[in-house]
């Protein structure tokens, strides 16, 4: 009889310890959260997905319970740190799902380490038209302070911008 075990731990990377939640059994599913969130962003779907996969939800460095990186990080830096963590955890190949900036990181993983990804699922992946990108980036930058952190919002604004997930459907899981 299989007993499902949930594990919360951290794994060392050259840039600091990366926190993760491991849940379920089966083929590895690496879950990458949106900017400014953490593993809790997956809390509404991880129970369902972990019935079919070994889910690894990571707090990217500088988020949640992970260490802050010691220097400025860009997307390729996050990908290298994540790959390092995955190799230590013996996740040599798996499915990757990313939400928002997590989707950008997942695409970087696919580009930098294609041998490590079986399937790639992108949720709310930011895509910009080159003609409108400068204006959109400038407007978006107004939401962040000089340290690159989101500016405080009212509760109503935060609630309106909150992340919500659809209820996982069996056909989605079968398609993975």
Language-model segments: what does each one mean?
Residues 107-112, 117-151:
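Flexible "cap/lid" loop of the alpha/beta hydrolase fold
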Residues 29-32, 56, 96-111, 122:
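A generic "structured core" feature
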Residues 41-43, 66-72, 131-134:
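Conserved catalytic-core motifs of eukaryotic protein kinase domains, centered on the activation segment
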Residues 28, 52-54, 92-95, 116-119:
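Structural signature of beta-strand start/N-cap positions in the alpha/beta core
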Residues 13-15, 56-97, 101:
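Active-site loop/oxyanion-hole signature of alpha/beta-hydrolase fold enzymes
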Residues 131-138, 147-176:
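Conserved alpha/beta-hydrolase catalytic His-Asp/Glu region
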Residues 1-17:
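N-terminal cap/lid segment of alpha/beta-hydrolase-fold proteins
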Residues 16-65:
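Conserved HGGG/HGGXW glycine-rich cap/lid loop of the alpha/beta-hydrolase fold
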